Amino acid sequence: MAKERVDVLAYKQGLFETREQAKRGVMAGLVVAVLNGERFDKPGEKIPDDTELKLKGEKLKYVSRGGLKLEKALQVFDLSVEGATTIDIGASTGGFTDVMLQNGAELVFAVDVGTNQLAWKLRQDPRVVSMEQFNFRYAEKTDFEQEPSFASIDVSFISLSLILPALHRVLADQGQVVALVKPQFEAGREQIGKNGIIRDAKVHQHVLESVTAMAVEQGFSVLGLDYSPIQGGHGNIEFLAYLKKEEEASNQVAPEIEKVVERAHREFKDE
């Protein structure tokens, strides 16, 4: 049976946002096995890679904290996935997939360019179609046995401008989208600070203006905008956009962008 380091496994299962956090958490005795409560405190210890881990004493609502991003989006944009066929683009461990299932999705296509990341409980769920090593940039309608009416996007190291054209091909007319906008992967290199962090509110505003305009060009109306409740890698502020595939697409959030950025910076000013 294949084995993996405890800290790497804890990170892959979504217990921590970064490998470094996972390492520290293991050393602090925070990581235990779901099955028998066995505690692991040596980050480099190798254990079977199908060992389900959790944080000591904590009941996670979703398989990863990332699920809280989509949870917020469904609430603030008043969206429902009840009975829907959906796509989770950039599924990773499956936080967004878990949210969709817990909110009544009938079928979820969990798409990721990587492999062996989706949480075990989701792999076993008959409502989940795991599509690993799948580059969504080249997706076609025929790749999906049912037409999705809802999609979420949480991708890294790639611009949304490379994802939305493919999604437009695949998604049903009037289909809804929650897209995580990550300025660190949308801004020009000269706008990104040390360690890949963007702290300048003006850069955030510029990115949101250009991304929302691009979405309209690709056939998606932009109907809602807010900030993500969780910061991205290295503490980057990220944003949630609500899009809808429409024949006559429009940008309805343009006047709100500056205020959304201001709220985000107030929320995370001490972090």
What are these regions (language model features)?
Residues 81-92, 100:
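Conserved class I S-adenosyl-L-methionine
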Residues 108-162:
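S-adenosyl-L-methionine
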